[in-house]
């Protein structure tokens, strides 16, 4: 098959891009021809298709009034993207199009490329976040509270609650985008939506998507991650034990809750146990101030190591005693947890979104209530006791590795996905 994969970012930015590039790798292993459609950017990985990538767009920086008007229009519908995608389709002649992150920088205008209708090309969309039912995509309102207000299709709630970064203008633009896509029936042009978690599928159905349009397929792990899980070597740093948070330092990730909980626990924790925070983001200064205010002991026991390469992150995950997923928002199917499991590192995870589908109390980790310092504090104390019980800890490590090997096979995912591709091709072409 010839497959076009679509994603706004063409470099390893986050979990969506891990999936996007992993998909290309897995499909090529099976002998399929893969092409890309993305946004231009200085960090992009080289691609033979880059001459048709869309112009870079940044909706977060300061802009003049004419720029804002232009941005508002192209955010909702990009004529440039439609025309360039049509040119790519004419050149590649795809059998299937598989979209990932496309809203705002690319837009769903590409679904109007005439080639798709003329040649009955099936389109899939992997739902990495909640943009299909929430203009703010994380199902949090402007105050950072969990929010289901737009599930009934009334997207004016986004503007009313200033859900996008507390900004009336940005929330209004997001609302207009959602209303426009609903009015045009854009999502009806997608043949299958892939939900990586059962929770995601349930929310899409609550948001009005037909059950037959949404298929659950848990994300896969790349082969090197699977190889790491199969290796089974315990690389935990027993001499210098630490808990590990890795990810974006943002409010929805709950890193502030984690720091507060760890500081609260310091008098009760083993003297050697540290907290390592890997990543960067808007909450970094707040976290640094919390640590400094807590005094010298906290400063000695909490380390911010900043952004880490993939290789460095794997080393951190392998050596950590426990990883922490303290999210406030409804995470979909976090790759960070799968990568920790593959390293034999159990996880303390918030009971929210798709996290409980991965982190099961007493089996693959420990659980806590989202955004609750006391609950996370108690989970950390339970984790400290677990680490000291080497037999119970080793059993949990084995459970984590088994989960990845049994549930996250790249080969099986690719075979299931290509079978779905073929089913849609046959259906659309009347075979």
Segments (PLM) and residue ranges:
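Conserved donor-binding/catalytic core segment of Leloir-type glycosyltransferases
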Residues: 194, 234-253, 259-263, 276
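Carbohydrate-associated surface elements
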Residues: 199, 220
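Nucleotide-activated donor-binding/catalytic signature segment of Leloir-type glycosyltransferases, i.e.
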Residues: 288-311
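Short alpha-helical donor nucleotide-sugar binding micro-motif in glycosyltransferases
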Residues: 307-308, 315-320
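Acidic donor-binding loop of glycosyltransferase active sites
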Residues: 318-332, 345
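Short hydrophobic beta-strand element within catalytic cores of glycosyltransferases
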Residues: 346-349, 359
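Conserved acidic donor-binding segment of nucleotide-sugar-dependent glycosyltransferases
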Residues: 361-362, 366-374, 382-388
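A short, well-ordered alpha-helix in the C-terminal region of glycosyltransferases
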Residues: 391-419
